[in-house]
Amino acid sequence: MADIRLIVGLGNPGPEYENTRHNAGEWFLNQLADTYNAPLKPETKFFGKTARITIDGKDIRLLYPTTFMNKSGQAVAALANFYRIEPEQILVAFDELDLPPGVAKYKVGGSSSQNGVRDIVARMGNNKNFLRLRIGIGHPGHKSRVTGHVLGKPSAEEKTAIESAIDEAVRCTEILLKEDLKQAQNRLHSHKV
């Protein structure tokens, strides 16, 4: 059983970003919160919206930072420090250029080119040992097109594929919390759209 106490969904705040690929982490967190009937509420001391859920008797905090993506670590560090949550007890969901839409994968630690993840690493004392949920949004092909791609809205087909991966990721997060990472990975990593 994974000892996750905080689940974070990354995105940019505001209605203009709500439906962009860069907010796939927020989409996941909203889906998880809806599944557990736990509305996210503004919490200024944590620079975001928070909720509490219980899975298999475990008390878990949900956090959507309302800072911009590249300042996500401010919110994560504030909540983690307040509740004495270690990096190894955190799951961070975010958009991943290197995976196609419809694919989501867990990864423990390591580096990332995702700005929100990099800021979390920096704010957590350069500790990279938190669990990541990488939600595929696809790569536009050339690095000069990345910003427009992540800040753009997915096509209807891409959106359906991303939502399918998120639905499966919510189910697998339950497996992660009730059983273990290996079982959750095996199921999530074999998901096909």
From Swiss-Prot:
The UniProt record lists the keyword Ligase: no
Catalytic activity entry: an N-acyl-L-alpha-aminoacyl-tRNA + H2O = an N-acyl-L-amino acid + a tRNA + H(+)
Alphabetic keyword roster: Cytoplasm, Hydrolase, RNA-binding, tRNA-binding
EC primary class: hydrolase
Molecular function, one GO term: peptidyl-tRNA hydrolase activity
Pfam families: Pept_tRNA_hydro (PF01195)
Gene Ontology BP terms: protein quality control for misfolded or incompletely synthesized proteins; rescue of stalled ribosome
Residues reported to bind tRNA: Y17, F68, N70, N115
Site (Discriminates between blocked and unblocked aminoacyl-tRNA): N12
Primary location: cytoplasm
InterPro entries found in the cross-reference section: Pept_tRNA_hydro (IPR001328), Pept_tRNA_hydro_CS (IPR018171), Pept_tRNA_hydro_sf (IPR036416)
NCBIfam families the record matches: pth
Protein name per its UniProtKB record: Peptidyl-tRNA hydrolase
Species annotation: Alteromonas mediterranea (strain DSM 17117 / CIP 110805 / LMG 28347 / Deep ecotype)
